Amino acid sequence: MGKIDVDKILFFNQEIRLWQLIMATPEENSNPHDRATPQLPAQLQELEHRVARRRLSQARHRATLAALFNNLRKTVYSQSDLIASKWQVLNKAKSHIPELEQTLDNLLKLKASFNLEDGHASSLEEVKKEYASMYSGNDSFPQNGSSPWYLNFYKQTMDLLTGSGIITPQEAALPIVSAAISHLWQNLSEERKASLRQAWAQKHRGPATLAEACREPACAEGSVKDSGVDSQGASCSLVSTPEEILFEDAFDVASFLDKSEVPSTSSSSSVLASCNPENPEEKFQLYMQIINFFKGLSCANTQVKQEASFPVDEEMIMLQCTETFDDEDL
């Protein structure tokens, strides 16, 4: 008998509840004034559309990951080993990359011994620096809040949260923490983002940079992008942003490769379960704990929108917290 996935059961129960609300008939209340205001069904229909959009986004995301894993599998394995699982591919790549670096280093040393000056890198360290500059330089991405700025923000935020004791190092690996950080980034005003970029350009990359920017006087209310769960840009929205997908994938891979021992198939689920609270309410509380910490710093207007007559948004966040990828995706 297979292992019961509690998260999937909770998520399924949420879907059943949503479907029951959608299929509820109006005969239960025959008041014509109530039937004249179809606000509740309209919001339920919008909620259903948003869930469908997010699932489509996740399906595309998984298809992209599957293609990347297939290419990596073909690179690190021979044709006879193309059925290797994803964690086997990642661990094979962990040893394959140093082998390639060693080969490149030997070739570069051979080139240097013959005094071959071709204008290109002459050492492994120079190659690494050139490669890093290709993907982290200011000219590689637009300076409008895309990947390099978000990665700097993510690192500083994580350092500030762990240094302040808001989260533990173990909790730093949770997807809900990434969701909260993405929400904070989406809610930063353009003025605060510009202040952070200026500090990063001056190579002040410590956690104090973020804390100081958060303590600046609050900007006008209209300049703050309150995304909440209605936004299509934040992680708690129903469509993942490119920078969120980029960093979550990179963080998952880095965490996986950081393990000193290869997990067995039977223990992989238990390893992942130990890093994820099974109770969606605990995930939601952790999310709000991070948000409230930065609200205390006046970092952003990070209130989650709530409809007084139809408080669906909080349930949607908790539904988000129950979503997990299958074990085979890891």
Swiss-Prot record:
Species the sequence originates in = Homo sapiens (Human)
Q: Which GO terms describe its cellular component?
A: cytoplasm; nucleus
User: Which protein are we looking at?
Assistant: Stimulated by retinoic acid gene 8 protein homolog
Q: What is the protein's major site of localization?
A: cytoplasm
Q: How does it assemble?
A: Interacts with XPO1. Interacts with MEIOSIN.
Protein's job? Meiosis-inducer required for the transition into meiosis for both female and male germ cells. In female germ cells, acts downstream of ZGLP1 as a key effector of the meiotic program: required for premeiotic DNA replication and subsequent events in meiotic prophase. During spermatogenesis, next to its role in meiotic initiation, promotes (but is not required for) spermatogonial differentiation. In complex with MEIOSIN, directly activates the transcription of a subset of critical meiotic genes playing a central role in cell-cycle switching from mitosis to meiosis.
Q: Which UniProt keywords apply?
A: Coiled coil, Cytoplasm, Differentiation, DNA replication, Meiosis, Nucleus, Oogenesis, Phosphoprotein, Spermatogenesis, Transcription, Transcription regulation
Q: In which tissues is it expressed?
A: Expressed specifically in testis and fetal ovaries.
Determine if Transcription is one of this entry's keywords: yes
Look up the domain of life of the source.
Eukaryota
Q: What does the UniProt record tell us about how this protein is modified after translation?
A: Phosphorylated.
Q: Where is this motif: Nuclear localization signal (NLS)?
A: 50-55
Cite the InterPro entries for this sequence: bHLH_STRA8, HLH_DNA-bd_sf, Stra8
